[in-house]
Amino acid sequence: MGKKNDNTLVKNASFLMIAALISKIIGMLYKSPLSNTLGNSSMGLFNYAQNVYFILLMIASFSIPQAVSKIMAEKLAFKRYRDAQKVFRCALLYVIIMGGVVALFCLFGSSILVPESMSGARLALKMLAPTIFLSGILGTFRGYFQAYRNMLPTSLSQIVEQCFVAVFAILMSAVMLNKFSGAEESVRNAWGAAGATMGTGAGVASALLFMLFVYWVNRKNIKKRLARDTHSRDEATSEVMKNIVLIVMPIILSSFIYNVNGFINSYMYSGIQGFKGLDHDTITSLYAEYGYYMTLINIPLTLASTAPTSMIPEVSAQYAKRDMGSARDKIDRATWISMFISIPCAVGLAVLAGPITRLLFPRTEGAAAQLMMLGVITIILNGNSNISNGVLQGIGKPNIPMINAAIALVVDVAAMAILLLATDLGVYAIVVAMIIYAVVMCLLNERAMKQYMQYKNPWRSAYLNPLLASVPMAVVAGFSYYGIYKLIHSNFISLGIAVVLGVIVYFIVYLAVSKPSDEQFAMMPGGAYLKKIAGKLPL
Protein backbone atom coordinates (compact mmCIF):
# COMPACT_ATOMS: atom_id res chain seq x y z
CA MET A 1 0.00 0.00 0.00
CA GLY A 2 2.82 2.37 0.91
CA LYS A 3 4.56 1.66 -2.39
CA LYS A 4 1.33 2.35 -4.28
CA ASN A 5 0.93 5.69 -2.49
CA ASP A 6 4.56 6.57 -3.27
CA ASN A 7 4.00 5.73 -6.94
CA THR A 8 0.87 7.90 -7.03
CA LEU A 9 2.77 10.69 -5.32
CA VAL A 10 5.61 10.53 -7.82
CA LYS A 11 3.17 10.32 -10.76
CA ASN A 12 1.17 13.34 -9.57
CA ALA A 13 4.39 15.24 -8.88
CA SER A 14 5.59 14.37 -12.39
CA PHE A 15 2.35 15.63 -13.98
CA LEU A 16 2.62 18.92 -12.11
CA MET A 17 6.34 19.32 -12.77
CA ILE A 18 6.04 18.64 -16.51
CA ALA A 19 3.01 20.93 -16.86
CA ALA A 20 4.71 23.68 -14.86
CA LEU A 21 7.85 23.37 -16.96
CA ILE A 22 5.96 23.44 -20.27
CA SER A 23 3.86 26.39 -19.08
CA LYS A 24 6.92 28.36 -17.99
CA ILE A 25 8.76 27.61 -21.23
CA ILE A 26 5.75 28.81 -23.26
CA GLY A 27 5.57 31.87 -21.01
CA MET A 28 9.24 32.58 -21.61
CA LEU A 29 9.13 32.02 -25.36
CA TYR A 30 6.14 34.26 -26.06
CA LYS A 31 7.69 37.10 -24.05
CA SER A 32 10.37 37.38 -26.74
CA PRO A 33 8.08 38.29 -29.68
CA LEU A 34 5.86 40.22 -27.27
CA SER A 35 8.76 42.43 -26.18
CA ASN A 36 9.70 42.96 -29.83
CA THR A 37 6.12 44.00 -30.57
CA LEU A 38 5.68 46.29 -27.57
CA GLY A 39 9.14 47.78 -27.08
CA ASN A 40 10.74 48.26 -23.67
CA SER A 41 8.51 51.08 -22.40
CA SER A 42 5.23 49.31 -23.15
CA MET A 43 6.68 46.00 -21.94
CA GLY A 44 7.58 47.65 -18.64
CA LEU A 45 3.96 48.79 -18.22
CA PHE A 46 2.73 45.29 -19.01
CA ASN A 47 5.09 43.73 -16.45
CA TYR A 48 4.02 46.19 -13.78
CA ALA A 49 0.32 45.51 -14.38
CA GLN A 50 0.98 41.76 -14.21
CA ASN A 51 2.80 42.22 -10.90
CA VAL A 52 -0.15 44.04 -9.33
CA TYR A 53 -2.56 41.50 -10.85
CA PHE A 54 -0.67 38.67 -9.16
CA ILE A 55 -1.10 40.27 -5.73
CA LEU A 56 -4.82 40.89 -6.30
CA LEU A 57 -5.26 37.34 -7.56
CA MET A 58 -3.60 36.07 -4.41
CA ILE A 59 -6.14 37.91 -2.27
CA ALA A 60 -9.11 36.77 -4.38
CA SER A 61 -8.45 33.10 -4.99
CA PHE A 62 -4.77 32.10 -4.82
CA SER A 63 -5.26 29.39 -2.17
CA ILE A 64 -8.60 28.06 -3.39
CA PRO A 65 -7.27 24.94 -5.20
CA GLN A 66 -5.33 23.98 -2.08
CA ALA A 67 -8.27 24.61 0.27
CA VAL A 68 -10.82 22.81 -1.92
CA SER A 69 -8.60 19.77 -2.44
CA LYS A 70 -7.75 19.58 1.28
CA ILE A 71 -11.33 19.79 2.60
CA MET A 72 -12.78 17.59 -0.14
CA ALA A 73 -10.04 14.97 0.33
CA GLU A 74 -10.96 14.70 4.01
CA LYS A 75 -14.58 13.92 3.03
CA LEU A 76 -13.60 11.57 0.21
CA ALA A 77 -11.38 9.55 2.55
CA PHE A 78 -14.60 8.44 4.29
CA LYS A 79 -16.61 8.17 1.04
CA ARG A 80 -18.70 11.22 1.96
CA TYR A 81 -19.29 12.22 -1.66
CA ARG A 82 -22.28 14.53 -1.08
CA ASP A 83 -20.39 16.43 1.60
CA ALA A 84 -17.43 16.77 -0.76
CA GLN A 85 -19.72 18.06 -3.51
CA LYS A 86 -21.16 20.63 -1.11
CA VAL A 87 -17.61 21.84 -0.37
CA PHE A 88 -17.15 22.31 -4.11
CA ARG A 89 -20.38 24.32 -4.46
CA CYS A 90 -19.61 26.48 -1.43
CA ALA A 91 -16.11 27.14 -2.75
CA LEU A 92 -17.64 28.35 -6.02
CA LEU A 93 -19.87 30.73 -4.06
CA TYR A 94 -16.84 31.97 -2.10
CA VAL A 95 -14.75 32.74 -5.20
CA ILE A 96 -17.68 34.42 -6.97
CA ILE A 97 -18.09 36.81 -4.03
CA MET A 98 -14.39 37.38 -3.32
CA GLY A 99 -13.42 37.46 -6.98
CA GLY A 100 -16.17 39.95 -7.71
CA VAL A 101 -15.12 42.29 -4.91
CA VAL A 102 -11.41 42.19 -5.81
CA ALA A 103 -12.18 42.56 -9.54
CA LEU A 104 -14.20 45.71 -8.81
CA PHE A 105 -11.35 47.09 -6.70
CA CYS A 106 -8.96 46.35 -9.58
CA LEU A 107 -11.26 48.18 -11.99
CA PHE A 108 -11.92 51.28 -9.90
CA GLY A 109 -8.83 51.39 -7.66
CA SER A 110 -6.06 51.36 -10.25
CA SER A 111 -4.97 54.89 -9.30
CA ILE A 112 -4.27 53.62 -5.77
CA LEU A 113 -2.43 50.49 -6.91
CA VAL A 114 -0.25 52.10 -9.58
CA PRO A 115 1.96 55.16 -8.84
CA GLU A 116 1.92 58.20 -11.09
CA SER A 117 5.33 57.37 -12.58
CA MET A 118 3.77 54.13 -13.92
CA SER A 119 0.34 55.59 -14.73
CA GLY A 120 0.40 54.00 -18.18
CA ALA A 121 -0.04 50.59 -16.50
CA ARG A 122 -3.45 51.53 -15.05
CA LEU A 123 -5.33 50.75 -18.26
CA ALA A 124 -3.64 47.33 -18.50
CA LEU A 125 -4.56 46.61 -14.89
CA LYS A 126 -8.22 47.47 -15.52
CA MET A 127 -8.25 45.00 -18.41
CA LEU A 128 -7.28 42.27 -15.93
CA ALA A 129 -10.33 42.77 -13.68
CA PRO A 130 -12.52 40.11 -15.41
CA THR A 131 -9.57 37.71 -15.36
CA ILE A 132 -9.37 37.96 -11.56
CA PHE A 133 -13.04 36.95 -11.34
CA LEU A 134 -12.67 33.97 -13.70
CA SER A 135 -9.44 32.77 -12.07
CA GLY A 136 -11.21 31.92 -8.82
CA ILE A 137 -13.73 29.72 -10.61
CA LEU A 138 -10.92 28.04 -12.54
CA GLY A 139 -9.00 27.39 -9.32
CA THR A 140 -12.05 25.77 -7.72
CA PHE A 141 -12.41 23.28 -10.57
CA ARG A 142 -8.69 22.50 -10.40
CA GLY A 143 -8.95 21.87 -6.66
CA TYR A 144 -11.97 19.60 -7.26
CA PHE A 145 -10.01 17.18 -9.43
CA GLN A 146 -6.91 17.40 -7.25
CA ALA A 147 -9.05 16.19 -4.33
CA TYR A 148 -9.66 13.00 -6.33
CA ARG A 149 -5.86 12.76 -6.80
CA ASN A 150 -6.26 13.40 -10.50
CA MET A 151 -3.63 15.95 -11.47
CA LEU A 152 -3.96 15.46 -15.23
CA PRO A 153 -6.85 17.95 -15.81
CA THR A 154 -5.01 20.63 -13.83
CA SER A 155 -1.77 19.95 -15.68
CA LEU A 156 -3.39 20.03 -19.13
CA SER A 157 -5.40 23.15 -18.29
CA GLN A 158 -2.19 24.96 -17.34
CA ILE A 159 -0.71 24.16 -20.74
CA VAL A 160 -3.93 25.19 -22.54
CA GLU A 161 -3.94 28.43 -20.55
CA GLN A 162 -0.38 29.35 -21.48
CA CYS A 163 -0.91 28.56 -25.17
CA PHE A 164 -3.88 30.93 -25.36
CA VAL A 165 -2.03 33.56 -23.30
CA ALA A 166 0.88 33.46 -25.74
CA VAL A 167 -1.22 33.70 -28.92
CA PHE A 168 -3.66 36.36 -27.74
CA ALA A 169 -1.08 38.52 -25.94
CA ILE A 170 0.98 38.89 -29.11
CA LEU A 171 -2.08 39.24 -31.35
CA MET A 172 -3.97 41.80 -29.25
CA SER A 173 -0.90 43.89 -28.46
CA ALA A 174 -0.21 44.18 -32.20
CA VAL A 175 -3.87 45.04 -32.85
CA MET A 176 -3.88 47.77 -30.20
CA LEU A 177 -0.57 49.27 -31.31
CA ASN A 178 -1.86 49.41 -34.87
CA LYS A 179 -5.19 50.90 -33.80
CA PHE A 180 -3.46 53.68 -31.82
CA SER A 181 -0.52 54.13 -34.18
CA GLY A 182 -1.35 57.81 -34.67
CA ALA A 183 -1.72 58.61 -30.97
CA GLU A 184 0.89 60.02 -28.59
CA GLU A 185 3.61 57.57 -27.61
CA SER A 186 2.42 57.35 -23.99
CA VAL A 187 -1.13 56.50 -25.12
CA ARG A 188 0.16 53.98 -27.64
CA ASN A 189 2.35 52.31 -25.00
CA ALA A 190 -0.55 52.10 -22.55
CA TRP A 191 -2.86 50.46 -25.10
CA GLY A 192 -0.11 48.09 -26.23
CA ALA A 193 0.32 46.89 -22.65
CA ALA A 194 -3.46 46.63 -22.26
CA GLY A 195 -3.66 44.48 -25.39
CA ALA A 196 -1.00 42.15 -23.98
CA THR A 197 -2.99 41.67 -20.76
CA MET A 198 -5.96 40.53 -22.84
CA GLY A 199 -3.88 37.42 -23.48
CA THR A 200 -3.97 36.64 -19.75
CA GLY A 201 -7.75 36.86 -19.83
CA ALA A 202 -7.99 34.65 -22.91
CA GLY A 203 -5.74 32.07 -21.23
CA VAL A 204 -7.80 31.88 -18.05
CA ALA A 205 -11.07 31.75 -20.01
CA SER A 206 -9.81 28.91 -22.23
CA ALA A 207 -8.51 26.92 -19.23
CA LEU A 208 -11.86 27.39 -17.48
CA LEU A 209 -13.73 26.13 -20.55
CA PHE A 210 -11.40 23.11 -20.62
CA MET A 211 -12.07 22.32 -16.95
CA LEU A 212 -15.83 22.73 -17.48
CA PHE A 213 -15.58 20.26 -20.36
CA VAL A 214 -13.68 17.75 -18.17
CA TYR A 215 -16.30 18.14 -15.44
CA TRP A 216 -19.09 17.63 -18.01
CA VAL A 217 -17.42 14.46 -19.32
CA ASN A 218 -17.25 13.11 -15.76
CA ARG A 219 -20.78 14.17 -14.79
CA LYS A 220 -22.23 10.62 -14.92
CA ASN A 221 -19.56 9.25 -12.60
CA ILE A 222 -20.10 12.19 -10.27
CA LYS A 223 -23.86 11.52 -10.13
CA LYS A 224 -23.26 7.81 -9.48
CA ARG A 225 -21.01 8.59 -6.53
CA LEU A 226 -23.56 10.96 -5.08
CA ALA A 227 -26.39 8.44 -5.56
CA ARG A 228 -24.63 5.58 -3.74
CA ASP A 229 -23.33 7.76 -0.90
CA THR A 230 -24.52 6.49 2.49
CA HIS A 231 -21.87 8.13 4.68
CA SER A 232 -22.41 11.88 4.25
CA ARG A 233 -23.56 13.94 7.21
CA ASP A 234 -25.15 16.66 5.08
CA GLU A 235 -23.32 19.47 6.83
CA ALA A 236 -24.88 22.92 6.96
CA THR A 237 -23.77 25.32 4.25
CA SER A 238 -22.70 27.84 6.89
CA GLU A 239 -20.41 25.25 8.50
CA VAL A 240 -18.81 24.38 5.17
CA MET A 241 -18.27 28.05 4.32
CA LYS A 242 -16.72 28.60 7.73
CA ASN A 243 -14.27 25.74 7.17
CA ILE A 244 -13.30 27.12 3.76
CA VAL A 245 -12.68 30.60 5.18
CA LEU A 246 -10.69 29.23 8.14
CA ILE A 247 -8.38 27.34 5.79
CA VAL A 248 -8.18 29.96 3.03
CA MET A 249 -7.52 33.06 5.11
CA PRO A 250 -4.31 31.96 6.87
CA ILE A 251 -2.92 30.70 3.55
CA ILE A 252 -3.85 33.97 1.83
CA LEU A 253 -2.29 36.01 4.62
CA SER A 254 0.94 34.01 4.67
CA SER A 255 1.16 33.87 0.86
CA PHE A 256 0.44 37.60 0.66
CA ILE A 257 3.18 38.44 3.14
CA TYR A 258 5.55 36.02 1.42
CA ASN A 259 4.98 37.44 -2.08
CA VAL A 260 4.04 41.07 -1.56
CA ASN A 261 7.69 42.12 -1.38
CA GLY A 262 7.89 42.00 -5.18
CA PHE A 263 4.98 44.44 -5.49
CA ILE A 264 6.30 46.73 -2.73
CA ASN A 265 9.79 46.76 -4.25
CA SER A 266 8.36 47.64 -7.67
CA TYR A 267 6.13 50.36 -6.20
CA MET A 268 9.06 51.84 -4.26
CA TYR A 269 11.35 51.67 -7.29
CA SER A 270 8.97 53.51 -9.60
CA GLY A 271 7.87 56.00 -6.94
CA ILE A 272 11.31 56.91 -5.58
CA GLN A 273 12.96 57.00 -9.00
CA GLY A 274 10.21 59.35 -10.18
CA PHE A 275 10.74 61.47 -7.06
CA LYS A 276 14.48 61.64 -7.85
CA GLY A 277 13.66 63.03 -11.29
CA LEU A 278 14.20 60.00 -13.53
CA ASP A 279 12.06 60.30 -16.65
CA HIS A 280 9.07 58.04 -17.24
CA ASP A 281 10.51 56.18 -20.25
CA THR A 282 13.74 55.29 -18.43
CA ILE A 283 11.81 53.98 -15.42
CA THR A 284 9.56 51.77 -17.56
CA SER A 285 12.40 50.60 -19.84
CA LEU A 286 14.54 49.50 -16.90
CA TYR A 287 11.53 47.83 -15.33
CA ALA A 288 11.11 45.89 -18.58
CA GLU A 289 14.69 44.65 -18.14
CA TYR A 290 13.75 43.51 -14.64
CA GLY A 291 10.74 41.74 -16.18
CA TYR A 292 13.02 39.85 -18.59
CA TYR A 293 15.13 38.74 -15.63
CA MET A 294 12.07 37.56 -13.68
CA THR A 295 10.72 35.65 -16.69
CA LEU A 296 13.91 33.61 -16.89
CA ILE A 297 14.47 33.19 -13.16
CA ASN A 298 10.95 31.83 -12.59
CA ILE A 299 11.41 28.80 -14.85
CA PRO A 300 13.99 26.90 -12.75
CA LEU A 301 12.33 28.15 -9.56
CA THR A 302 8.98 26.69 -10.61
CA LEU A 303 10.52 23.44 -11.78
CA ALA A 304 12.57 23.06 -8.60
CA SER A 305 9.61 23.83 -6.32
CA THR A 306 6.73 21.89 -7.87
CA ALA A 307 7.80 18.30 -7.15
CA PRO A 308 9.15 18.97 -3.62
CA THR A 309 5.98 20.86 -2.70
CA SER A 310 3.84 17.89 -3.77
CA MET A 311 5.87 15.72 -1.37
CA ILE A 312 5.08 17.89 1.67
CA PRO A 313 1.81 16.00 2.53
CA GLU A 314 3.99 12.93 3.10
CA VAL A 315 6.02 14.91 5.64
CA SER A 316 2.78 15.92 7.37
CA ALA A 317 1.60 12.31 7.53
CA GLN A 318 4.85 11.05 9.09
CA TYR A 319 4.93 13.95 11.55
CA ALA A 320 1.35 13.19 12.62
CA LYS A 321 2.46 9.62 13.40
CA ARG A 322 5.37 11.07 15.42
CA ASP A 323 7.75 9.24 13.09
CA MET A 324 10.31 12.03 13.06
CA GLY A 325 12.98 9.99 11.31
CA SER A 326 10.75 9.29 8.31
CA ALA A 327 9.55 12.91 8.27
CA ARG A 328 13.13 14.19 8.16
CA ASP A 329 13.93 11.67 5.43
CA LYS A 330 11.04 13.03 3.31
CA ILE A 331 12.35 16.57 3.79
CA ASP A 332 15.81 15.42 2.71
CA ARG A 333 14.30 13.97 -0.47
CA ALA A 334 12.39 17.17 -1.22
CA THR A 335 15.49 19.29 -0.58
CA TRP A 336 17.65 17.01 -2.71
CA ILE A 337 15.42 17.15 -5.80
CA SER A 338 15.03 20.93 -5.43
CA MET A 339 18.78 21.58 -5.23
CA PHE A 340 19.56 18.99 -7.93
CA ILE A 341 17.66 21.30 -10.28
CA SER A 342 18.20 24.73 -8.68
CA ILE A 343 21.98 24.82 -8.33
CA PRO A 344 22.98 23.93 -11.91
CA CYS A 345 20.25 26.22 -13.26
CA ALA A 346 21.56 29.11 -11.17
CA VAL A 347 25.16 28.51 -12.22
CA GLY A 348 24.24 28.02 -15.88
CA LEU A 349 22.12 31.17 -16.03
CA ALA A 350 24.92 33.19 -14.44
CA VAL A 351 27.54 31.97 -16.94
CA LEU A 352 25.32 32.31 -20.02
CA ALA A 353 23.24 35.31 -18.89
CA GLY A 354 24.28 37.54 -21.78
CA PRO A 355 23.71 35.06 -24.62
CA ILE A 356 20.38 33.86 -23.18
CA THR A 357 18.89 37.32 -22.69
CA ARG A 358 20.09 38.49 -26.11
CA LEU A 359 18.54 35.43 -27.77
CA LEU A 360 15.16 35.63 -26.05
CA PHE A 361 14.85 39.39 -25.70
CA PRO A 362 16.63 41.11 -28.61
CA ARG A 363 15.45 44.52 -27.39
CA THR A 364 17.36 44.18 -24.12
CA GLU A 365 19.96 46.86 -23.49
CA GLY A 366 22.10 44.54 -21.34
CA ALA A 367 20.66 45.27 -17.90
CA ALA A 368 18.68 42.00 -17.85
CA ALA A 369 21.90 39.95 -18.13
CA GLN A 370 23.54 41.94 -15.33
CA LEU A 371 20.45 41.49 -13.16
CA MET A 372 20.62 37.77 -13.92
CA MET A 373 24.25 37.42 -12.87
CA LEU A 374 23.48 39.31 -9.67
CA GLY A 375 20.23 37.56 -8.79
CA VAL A 376 20.60 33.86 -9.69
CA ILE A 377 21.33 33.04 -6.05
CA THR A 378 17.62 33.64 -5.36
CA ILE A 379 16.81 30.44 -7.29
CA ILE A 380 18.63 28.40 -4.63
CA LEU A 381 17.44 30.49 -1.68
CA ASN A 382 13.78 30.50 -2.74
CA GLY A 383 13.91 26.79 -3.52
CA ASN A 384 15.05 26.20 0.06
CA SER A 385 12.49 28.50 1.66
CA ASN A 386 9.60 27.10 -0.39
CA ILE A 387 10.28 23.67 1.09
CA SER A 388 10.67 24.94 4.65
CA ASN A 389 7.48 27.00 4.33
CA GLY A 390 5.56 23.92 3.20
CA VAL A 391 7.02 21.74 5.95
CA LEU A 392 6.26 24.20 8.74
CA GLN A 393 2.70 24.65 7.47
CA GLY A 394 2.35 20.87 7.09
CA ILE A 395 3.34 20.12 10.70
CA GLY A 396 0.77 22.53 12.07
CA LYS A 397 2.99 25.60 12.50
CA PRO A 398 1.58 27.90 9.78
CA ASN A 399 2.14 31.05 11.82
CA ILE A 400 5.90 30.58 11.92
CA PRO A 401 6.67 31.05 8.19
CA MET A 402 4.14 33.88 8.17
CA ILE A 403 5.93 35.67 11.02
CA ASN A 404 9.30 34.94 9.41
CA ALA A 405 8.04 36.35 6.11
CA ALA A 406 6.82 39.49 7.90
CA ILE A 407 10.25 39.97 9.51
CA ALA A 408 11.98 39.41 6.16
CA LEU A 409 9.57 41.88 4.54
CA VAL A 410 10.46 44.61 7.05
CA VAL A 411 14.17 44.03 6.40
CA ASP A 412 13.51 44.01 2.64
CA VAL A 413 11.61 47.31 2.68
CA ALA A 414 14.24 48.99 4.86
CA ALA A 415 17.04 47.76 2.59
CA MET A 416 15.12 48.84 -0.52
CA ALA A 417 14.55 52.34 0.84
CA ILE A 418 18.23 52.77 1.79
CA LEU A 419 19.48 51.41 -1.54
CA LEU A 420 17.19 53.64 -3.61
CA LEU A 421 17.68 56.83 -1.59
CA ALA A 422 21.39 56.52 -0.76
CA THR A 423 22.74 54.92 -3.94
CA ASP A 424 22.27 55.04 -7.70
CA LEU A 425 21.57 51.31 -8.02
CA GLY A 426 18.12 51.96 -9.46
CA VAL A 427 16.47 48.77 -10.71
CA TYR A 428 19.39 46.69 -9.37
CA ALA A 429 18.20 47.62 -5.88
CA ILE A 430 15.12 45.42 -6.42
CA VAL A 431 17.29 42.34 -6.97
CA VAL A 432 19.59 43.13 -4.02
CA ALA A 433 16.52 43.54 -1.78
CA MET A 434 15.15 40.22 -3.09
CA ILE A 435 18.40 38.48 -2.12
CA ILE A 436 18.32 40.02 1.36
CA TYR A 437 14.69 38.95 1.81
CA ALA A 438 15.43 35.38 0.72
CA VAL A 439 18.49 35.05 3.00
CA VAL A 440 16.53 36.25 6.05
CA MET A 441 13.66 33.89 5.22
CA CYS A 442 15.97 30.88 4.86
CA LEU A 443 17.80 31.57 8.13
CA LEU A 444 14.62 32.06 10.16
CA ASN A 445 12.90 29.01 8.69
CA GLU A 446 15.96 26.83 9.23
CA ARG A 447 16.05 27.85 12.88
CA ALA A 448 12.38 26.87 13.24
CA MET A 449 12.98 23.50 11.53
CA LYS A 450 15.78 22.74 14.00
CA GLN A 451 13.57 23.73 16.91
CA TYR A 452 10.48 21.69 16.01
CA MET A 453 11.94 18.77 14.04
CA GLN A 454 15.61 18.68 15.05
CA TYR A 455 16.22 18.94 11.32
CA LYS A 456 19.57 19.72 9.72
CA ASN A 457 20.00 20.41 6.03
CA PRO A 458 21.78 17.61 4.12
CA TRP A 459 24.53 19.95 2.97
CA ARG A 460 26.72 17.39 1.23
CA SER A 461 24.12 15.37 -0.69
CA ALA A 462 21.72 18.23 -1.46
CA TYR A 463 24.05 21.22 -1.89
CA LEU A 464 27.72 20.27 -2.23
CA ASN A 465 27.33 17.47 -4.79
CA PRO A 466 25.24 19.54 -7.25
CA LEU A 467 27.66 22.45 -6.79
CA LEU A 468 30.70 20.25 -7.48
CA ALA A 469 29.02 19.00 -10.65
CA SER A 470 27.99 22.53 -11.66
CA VAL A 471 31.53 23.94 -11.67
CA PRO A 472 32.87 21.83 -14.58
CA MET A 473 29.48 22.24 -16.25
CA ALA A 474 29.92 26.03 -16.13
CA VAL A 475 33.48 25.84 -17.45
CA VAL A 476 32.49 23.62 -20.38
CA ALA A 477 29.36 25.64 -21.19
CA GLY A 478 31.16 28.98 -21.02
CA PHE A 479 34.22 28.00 -23.04
CA SER A 480 32.20 26.06 -25.62
CA TYR A 481 29.79 28.96 -26.17
CA TYR A 482 32.42 31.65 -26.67
CA GLY A 483 34.68 29.32 -28.66
CA ILE A 484 31.92 28.24 -31.05
CA TYR A 485 30.52 31.77 -31.32
CA LYS A 486 33.96 33.05 -32.34
CA LEU A 487 33.95 30.56 -35.21
CA ILE A 488 30.36 30.75 -36.53
CA HIS A 489 28.94 34.00 -35.04
CA SER A 490 25.55 32.38 -34.36
CA ASN A 491 24.20 33.03 -30.88
CA PHE A 492 21.41 30.43 -31.23
CA ILE A 493 23.63 27.54 -32.39
CA SER A 494 26.46 28.39 -30.00
CA LEU A 495 24.08 28.61 -27.06
CA GLY A 496 22.28 25.39 -27.97
CA ILE A 497 25.53 23.41 -28.19
CA ALA A 498 26.84 24.97 -24.96
CA VAL A 499 23.67 24.08 -23.04
CA VAL A 500 23.64 20.48 -24.30
CA LEU A 501 27.32 19.99 -23.45
CA GLY A 502 26.79 21.59 -20.04
CA VAL A 503 23.87 19.28 -19.20
CA ILE A 504 25.87 16.20 -20.25
CA VAL A 505 28.89 17.23 -18.17
CA TYR A 506 26.69 18.02 -15.14
CA PHE A 507 24.99 14.64 -15.29
CA ILE A 508 28.24 12.67 -15.71
CA VAL A 509 30.11 14.53 -12.95
CA TYR A 510 27.08 14.32 -10.65
CA LEU A 511 26.94 10.55 -11.11
CA ALA A 512 30.64 10.33 -10.28
CA VAL A 513 30.50 12.43 -7.09
CA SER A 514 27.05 11.43 -5.83
CA LYS A 515 26.21 7.92 -7.09
CA PRO A 516 22.41 8.45 -6.79
CA SER A 517 20.18 5.64 -5.53
CA ASP A 518 17.29 4.07 -7.47
CA GLU A 519 14.91 6.17 -5.37
CA GLN A 520 16.73 9.36 -6.33
CA PHE A 521 16.67 8.38 -10.00
CA ALA A 522 12.89 7.91 -9.69
CA MET A 523 12.50 11.50 -8.46
CA MET A 524 14.57 13.05 -11.25
CA PRO A 525 12.84 14.48 -14.33
CA GLY A 526 13.15 11.64 -16.86
CA GLY A 527 14.75 9.52 -14.12
CA ALA A 528 14.09 6.12 -15.72
CA TYR A 529 15.79 7.22 -18.94
CA LEU A 530 18.72 8.75 -17.05
CA LYS A 531 19.16 5.55 -15.03
CA LYS A 532 19.50 3.51 -18.24
CA ILE A 533 22.15 5.91 -19.54
CA ALA A 534 23.97 5.82 -16.21
CA GLY A 535 24.09 2.03 -16.34
CA LYS A 536 26.04 2.21 -19.59
CA LEU A 537 28.65 4.64 -18.28
CA PRO A 538 31.91 3.32 -16.76
CA LEU A 539 31.40 5.04 -13.40
Language-model region placement:
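Membrane-interface helix-loop junctions in multi-pass transport and translocation proteins
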Residues: 152, 163-214, 399, 409-443, ...
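Membrane-proximal transmembrane or re-entrant/amphipathic helices at the cytosolic face
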Residues: 479-539
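Alpha-helical transmembrane segments of multi-pass membrane transporters/permeases
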Residues: 14-19, 130, 141, 145-175, ...
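Interfacial segments at transmembrane-helix termini and the short loops linking adjacent helices
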Residues: 111-128, 284, 350-379
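N-terminal membrane topogenesis motif
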Residues: 1-26, 82, 86, 231-258, ...
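Interfacial/gating helices of multi-pass transporter permease domains
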Residues: 34-55, 189-194, 240-247, 270-297, ...
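Signature of the first transmembrane helix
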Residues: 8-66, 103, 132, 249-271
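Helix-loop junctions and terminal segments of transmembrane helices
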Residues: 62-77, 301-321
